[in-house]
Amino acid sequence: MYKVLSLIILFSLITKNAVSESKFYIIAKVNNEIITNYDVETESNYLKLLNPNLNQLDENKIIEIAKNSLINEVIKKKQLKKIFNFEQNQPVINKIFNDFYTNLGFLNEKDFKQVLKSKKSYTVLEIKEKIKIDFLWNKLIYNLHNKQIKIDKKKTFKQNQK
């Protein structure tokens, strides 16, 4: 009797895992990095947290935006790793992160973490990684193009006085 019960339990666990594994599927493959439907759903929840107006869009449109966001992130990260020491700790990221959740209306990191968990979004570490990618990408673009930008300080000063 014990063996039969054990086999039934084992079989049910195996089939349950097999069924639950089929819930995840590949949406895209970018630079040998796989993006799954779970990744897109998490990104979608994150984007909705950043911009609640996204909730007014059709769900398929939100999914498309999230997928494109993830694809862009993978491409940016690959390029950034060629130029920057990506693993190096950057203290400015913590400052940007604090400003980030404060601008979203959260009083502290703990409240922000709770909402992230309830919305099935990213962890704080994952968000800091996203912030690092954006920060380094903006830094790269600035470094590449800052010499091309010319600001007429006299004209700007006159416009600010009006």
Per-range role (PLM):
Residues 57-162:
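Peptidyl-prolyl cis-trans isomerase
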